[in-house]
Structure formats: structure tokens, C-alpha cells
């Protein structure tokens, strides 16, 4: 008996890929759904950070959908995932961003969280201390910078 394995096609991705939210293009329409003031703050800052890259954004819907609520003590402050892959499973048509209001965060931490989760919508993965030695990337998990560093911006340019 022969066994067959189905493999998804390989795709080019950013330098520190998140393996799951490769945007379908460089023009992303963003829509928030019944956000709290903190969720709105995070979304607005995340959108502004994307604008620093090769990705242009607009308000509307169809590309990035943003939600926030108390998701409980589940270990995450924010989460980004693809809810609608294109027909070939090579890029994401709709990316969902969720902010967890369960945690008490400062205004600066909400901005950092927005930057971080919107970084995932640009196909950025998490950074580690070993490749962010000056602690200035919002893609780090252990610290709370509020901006992408040049490495992040270069990775977005290369991967989208």
C-alpha cells in the first residue's frame, strides 16, 4: 500500500516569518469591530506603523479585521491569524487581529501591542534578544517597544 502526502506550496516570506499571515498584497484595508478605547488605540498605532513600511493602508474592510474583548487568562495579549486563505493557500485575504482586554496594560503597552500584532499582518514573526540586541523592535515578546526597527521594515519589504 502506498501512502501519499499533500504538501502546501512553499512561499517566499519575510526574514523572521510568522508562518501564517502572509498578506495577499501591499494595500491593506483595516476595519475595527466594536473596539474599546484601548483596542482603538492599539489599532490606530498598528495602522500607523504599517504605513512606515511598503504597505499602504486604508479604512474599510476586507483585509485586516480587528477585535478586542476579554479573552481570559489564556497567556496572550494579542493574536493574529488568517481567516481566509486565497485559493492556492499562498497568501491570506483576511487577517484577524484580536486584542485581549483581560490584561491591564499601559497606554504605551497598548501601542506596542498594536505594532506587534499588525507586524504579524505584514508576515513578521517574533524577534528574539539574539537578533534584536538593542531591544527596539515591537516584534519582541519580552519587551514593549512601540515601533518597527529597520530590520523589521527590511523584512516587510522583502517578504510582501
Q: What residues fall within each predicted segment?
A:
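Zinc-dependent metalloendopeptidases
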Residues: 11-160
Amino acid at each position: 500500500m502506498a501512502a501519499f502526502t499533500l504538501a502546501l506550496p512553499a512561499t517566499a516570506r519575510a526574514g523572521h516569518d510568522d508562518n501564517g499571515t502572509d498578506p495577499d498584497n501591499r494595500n491593506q484595508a483595516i476595519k475595527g469591530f466594536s473596539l474599546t478605547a484601548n483596542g482603538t488605540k492599539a489599532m490606530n498605532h498598528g495602522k500607523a506603523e504599517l504605513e512606515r513600511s511598503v504597505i499602504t493602508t486604508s479604512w474599510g474592510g476586507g483585509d485586516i479585521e480587528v477585535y478586542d474583548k476579554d479573552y481570559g487568562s489564556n497567556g496572550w495579549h494579542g493574536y493574529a491569524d488568517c481567516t481566509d486563505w486565497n485559493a492556492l493557500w499562498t497568501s491570506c485575504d483576511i487577517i484577524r487581529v484580536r486584542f485581549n482586554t483581560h490584561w491591564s496594560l499601559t497606554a504605551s503597552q497598548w501601542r506596542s501591542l498594536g505594532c506587534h500584532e499588525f507586524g504579524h499582518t505584514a508576515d513578521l514573526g517574533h524577534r528574539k534578544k539574539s537578533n534584536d540586541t538593542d531591544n527596539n523592535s515591537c516584534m519582541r515578546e519580552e519587551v514593549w517597544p512601540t515601533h518597527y526597527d529597520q530590520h523589521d521594515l527590511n523584512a516587510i519589504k522583502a517578504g510582501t
